[in-house]
């Protein structure tokens, strides 16, 4: 379905949306279900239709509530029975500059304009606070685009009487609010309108005829932007960028042209283009995107190219380098296996359309953008929205380092015939704590990013995690794993609710980076010990199958839980007699 990839095929998206929806549902029979409330300052029917399509593309089936035309503020402040009963998971406020009244005139004093600005901001801030108090869910708010006319020409942007100046100042207030409030996100239509072309974006025909805030053809771009935020919130981002080398990271073929013959660096325009792309990839690494190489090349030539004196990327910027003559789809599958990531975690970037087609056909789930001209590589990846950032943790900032440490562990394992001896050699320490304030952001992030080792796929906000931590009936544990190669950070989370002498486990997940290290044993030993100390006699666990978590289908059976229920969808319930549990005593020191 190339219509979803940049550049968007808006004609297909708008005209064939029902067919596309059927095809997307058939392709993903077990989507994540979410309720999205759209509070609009304009007509939003097409916005909801397009947003639904893009979310389905990311494996999220949305149910929508839409306010009546221009009733966004009234619905938020005074409520409606329909919205109250809807219980949204996400609220999207779709407003634009036409919802700003009044706007400055040349007759207004600067003091009056400042008061007007404060009043407009208070109008929105009061609404956001009311929604937070009532629904406690993420809120996505458009910033403001600008009119496609300027009353005073260039003066409009710097004169306080100008609409452009007023909107710019109001946007800054919105950004300050976003910076200081969790679960509040800006959908940047100021950028989208500039990228699309402000004259076409703000075509007044669509406002006066249909009360659409933007032109019809721009709505898919708007919906894609909102969908990128939502899929990021629910762990549907891509995690890794796999790059070809020749004519992708540099101009030329290193095996034929030699390192000196490659176009990279400041000497020629072509080299500048590739250097800029390498800089972009390096910047992606800095926000937690892991980089890998998949190239048909001799490894020595590939490494020589990556060590080019004018290059930006170096071999240690990559967590895996597959430079050989194997099919690229097999290399990509090998990288996925080594990193314990699903294929749908990857973006594959290659200048060769034949190689792209093979990978797209042979590795379902991988994103394969159409790279057309090196000068467009950055734009294509950026507009794809693969790596939308809604939260940035310390673990994200050192993601490449963590994977390099895992590679060192794999090398160390090869020296041992006995796996237990290998685990002992790692000198592991598991620090198992409650949901302490220091860890709240990372815990919430894990609930929204972990898909494979995740028994219930319960997605939680930071406020949800705080509520669990503050409830005396909740058992809340998170685990940090450290060994001689480094600190893995918080890698596992467990939460259960005690009712009498039973503990019901509603959340159990672990990062796949620490699979087969015994961390799950350490957590289970601790859960059972803590439960026993609370007077719990029975622990109840749940497994809810998804397209990605089959690996933990029999997780509880490994710890002598008995399966007590299973429904037609494969949802299972398991129980453990606490008194009968035998501790696993994993190969690590446990700190509490």
Label each region the model flagged.
Residues 484, 490-565:
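Acyl-donor binding region in acyl/amide transferases
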Residues 332-353, 359:
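Conserved Lys-Pro-Asp/Glu-containing loop-to-beta segment of HAD-superfamily phosphomonoesterases
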Residues 3-22, 193-240, 374, 378-429, ...:
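Flexible inter-domain linker/hinge segments
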Residues 431-511:
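A conserved beta-strand-loop-helix scaffold within acyl/acetyltransferase catalytic domains
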Residues 1-242, 249-250, 255-261, 354, ...:
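Extracellular glycan-modifying ectodomains
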Residues 338, 360, 364-426, 529-592:
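Terminal substrate-recognition subdomain of acyl/acetyltransferases
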Residues 254-279, 364-371:
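Basic, amphipathic juxtamembrane/active-site segments
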Residues 272, 276-307, 321, 359, ...:
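Substrate-recognition element of Asp-dependent hydrolases with the DxDx(T/V) motif
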């Amino acid at each position: 379905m190339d219509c979803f990839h940049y550049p968007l095929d808006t004609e297909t998206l708008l005209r064939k949306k029902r067919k596309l929806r059927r095809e997307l549902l058939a392709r993903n029979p077990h989507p994540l279900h979410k309720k999205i409330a759209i509070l609009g300052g304009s007509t939003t029917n097409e916005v909801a239709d397009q947003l639904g399509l893009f979310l389905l593309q990311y494996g999220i089936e949305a149910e929508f509530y839409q306010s009546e035309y221009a009733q966004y503020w009234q619905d938020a402040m005074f409520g409606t029975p329909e919205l109250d009963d809807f219980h949204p998971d996400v609220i999207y406020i779709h407003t634009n500059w036409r919802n700003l009244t009044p706007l400055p005139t040349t007759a207004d004093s600067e003091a009056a304009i400042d008061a007007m600005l404060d009043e407009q901001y208070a109008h929105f801030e009061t609404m956001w606070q009311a929604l937070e108090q009532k629904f406690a869910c993420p809120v996505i708010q458009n910033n403001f685009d600008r009119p496609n006319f300027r009353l005073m020409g260039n003066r409009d942007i710097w004169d306080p009487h100008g609409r452009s100046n007023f909107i710019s100042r109001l946007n800054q207030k919105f950004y300050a609010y976003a910076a200081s409030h969790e679960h509040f996100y800006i959908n940047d239509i100021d950028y989208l309108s500039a990228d699309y072309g402000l004259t076409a974006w703000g075509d007044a025909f669509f406002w006066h005829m249909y009360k659409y805030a933007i032109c019809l053809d721009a709505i898919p771009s708007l919906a894609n932007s909102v969908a990128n935020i939502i899929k990021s919130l629910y762990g549907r981002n891509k995690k890794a960028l796999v790059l070809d080398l020749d004519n992708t990271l540099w101009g030329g073929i290193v095996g034929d042209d030699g390192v000196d013959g490659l176009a990279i660096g400041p000497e020629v325009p072509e080299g500048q283009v590739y250097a800029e792309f390498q800089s972009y990839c390096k910047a992606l690494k800095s926000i937690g995107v892991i980089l890998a190489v998949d190239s048909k090349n001799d490894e020595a030539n590939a490494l020589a190219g990556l060590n080019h004196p004018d290059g930006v990327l170096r071999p240690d910027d990559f967590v895996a380098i597959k430079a050989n003559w194997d099919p690229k789809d097999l290399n990509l599958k090998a990288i996925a296996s080594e990193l314990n990531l699903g294929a749908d975690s990857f973006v594959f970037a290659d200048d060769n359309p034949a190689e792209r087609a093979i990978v797209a056909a042979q590795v379902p789930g991988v994103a394969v953008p159409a790279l057309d001209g090196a000068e467009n590589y950055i734009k294509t990846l950026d507009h794809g929205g693969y790596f939308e950032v809604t939260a940035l943790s310390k673990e994200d900032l050192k993601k490449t380092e963590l994977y390099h440490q895992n590679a060192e562990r794999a090398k160390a394992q090869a020296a041992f015939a006995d796996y237990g001896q290998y685990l002992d050699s790692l000198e592991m320490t598991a620090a198992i704590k409650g949901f302490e304030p220091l860890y709240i952001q990372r815990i919430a992030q894990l609930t929204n990013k972990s898909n494979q080792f995740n028994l219930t796929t319960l997605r939680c906000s930071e406020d949800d995690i705080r509520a669990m931590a503050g409830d005396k009936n909740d058992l809340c544990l998170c685990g940090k794993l450290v060994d001689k190669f480094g600190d893995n950070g918080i890698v596992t989370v467990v939460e259960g609710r005690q009712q009498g002498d039973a503990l019901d486990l509603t959340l159990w997940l672990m990062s796949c980076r620490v699979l087969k290290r015994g961390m799950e044993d350490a957590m289970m030993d601790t859960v059972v010990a803590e439960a026993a100390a609370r007077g719990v006699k029975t622990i109840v666990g749940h497994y809810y199958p998804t397209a990605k978590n089959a690996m933990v289908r029999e997780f509880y059976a490994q710890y002598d839980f008995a399966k007590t229920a299973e429904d037609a969808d494969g949802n299972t319930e398991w129980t453990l007699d606490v008194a009968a549990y035998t501790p696993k005593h994993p190969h690590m020191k446990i700190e509490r």
